[in-house]
Amino acid sequence: MERLPLSPAVLFLIIVLPILYLWIRYTAPARPHGKHLSLPPGPPRLPKIGNLHQVPRQIPWKKYKEWSDTYGPIMSVQLADTIAVVFSSWDLIKNHIERRNTIYSSRPSVPFFLHATGGLNASILPYGPEWKLQRAIRSSVLKPSMTVKYRDVQHVETTQLLHELLSTNDFPVCLRRCIASVFLTVAYGERCVDHAGLEAIDRLEELNRAIALHAEALFSGAAGILTQLVLPKALVDRLPVRWKKDADMLHNRLTADLVARTRAALVRPGWNWVKEFSMKDGIGSGDGDGEQGSKVELKRLAYMVGSLYEASMAASQALRVIILAGLLHPDATRRMHDELDAVVGTGRLPDFHDAAQLPYTQAFIKEAMRWRSLTPMGSPRATSDEDECRGYHIPCGATVLVNVWAINHDEAIFLDPFAFQPERWIENPDLPQLMYGMGQRACPGRHMGQDSLFLATARLFWAFDMALPDGADPIDQERFLDSGTTLAAFLPDFEVRFTPRSEKYQEVIENSMAVLPDVLSISATP
């Protein structure tokens, strides 16, 4: 039977109306069912991918700041099938997010990250019973009354740091060894005594870096467009990126490393975090040779301790920022030298009991962390319930981003925000500090991290003059301040020549190194 040709009207219905529907569906501001509030405003979106193509992989915080100047301090973007709400105002953080902590304390679901860590990394757990349990257990060894007992470990490792820098300028490796050894000592009961011991740490960092790079795809770039399109699961599994295969490989390698460390720590003499955690309610320390339950509990314990490593190592990156700030701002460095010399003198190393008399040194640290943040977009969160803010609807399950960089450079808070001015923190101690996050999702190790930063900074600047090596290219400040992605903003490499400020300082370092206590016996009785 001969088919009749389709009329123009029918063709219109078949072709044009579906396209029109999709355009309206994906570009019009979303409205929650049964409500009359719209999402916060934001840039126009494309079907399917939304604004994912507009978010740069590098320095995205400046693009978000540009948008917030147009759409306001609370705005939204669509990242494929995810709605992200971006806050760029300290007032909103303090008076809205902080007051609704239970709503804003979850994490966005990143399939690759969850798969690669087996859903056991506390930093990505959603708000709920498991996360609350892990937070309580980790807080038991990271509360201030406990972290003061780790100060002898920090004394030993920072003394060795100074001694190493007497004979090498390879400061990034020296910083990593120092901070890693503090963590390994209290967590597993073993020191990283020399640079050769960093090989195992390198493997762990390589795995964590690979996982973070894949997770980054959720927030920006062409890779995000590929992995975040709403496609059937069977098709996703056959995508060329083979994300599940990569995730399985990383998970197996990461688990093997963490479980091996945990097993060794359980039988090692003395006290450590692994042993402490294994005795808490809800956590087992099965050796994995018996039933499946034992394997799961050992693996859970291994990730609970191991997931703290990445957070602890942020201190080594922070110290690099502080050293860079010292190189680029010699007047501030001289003022810190003067303060350290007046309080400490030349006959001993700076110590924790000096902190109250070193306000400029502490202000220098705070200003360096504001001037060049390590997490300019904070740690992404997710809402566990719907909310309303300034007349806008924030849906349950939305990703929440805090533009830390925008807040740190808000002229209404920080006068002349692009200038490096440590004294601002002395004049106004209540300025917002966002390095360690906020609310229930604030970094659990912040007290220990603050101690490590203070002691290492005070000792490094007390002991050494720091300068670029002879013949080195000048530091391009813009390049160092404008680098990074949504999840991290680590500094590019740079060189420094460390020179003892006088023979007296060198003698104190060498004498202190010769009488270091046994740090493992110190940590055995926390």
From Swiss-Prot:
Its cofactor is heme. One of its GO terms (molecular function) is heme binding. GO terms for cellular component: membrane. It is found in: Membrane. It is an enzyme of class 1 (oxidoreductase). InterPro entries: Cyt_P450, Cyt_P450_E_grp-I, Cyt_P450_sf, Cytochrome_P450_fung. Keywords: Heme, Iron, Membrane, Metal-binding, Monooxygenase, Oxidoreductase, Transmembrane, Transmembrane helix, Virulence. It catalyses: tryprostatin A + reduced [NADPH--hemoprotein reductase] + O2 = fumitremorgin C + oxidized [NADPH--hemoprotein reductase] + 2 H2O + H(+). It is a single-pass membrane protein. Its main location: membrane. Pathway: Mycotoxin biosynthesis. Heme binds at residue 443. Its EC number is 1.14.19.71. PANTHER family: P450, PUTATIVE (EUROFUNG)-RELATED, P450, PUTATIVE (EUROFUNG)-RELATED-RELATED. This is Fumitremorgin C synthase. It comes from Aspergillus fumigatus (strain ATCC MYA-4609 / CBS 101355 / FGSC A1100 / Af293). The gene is ftmP450-2.
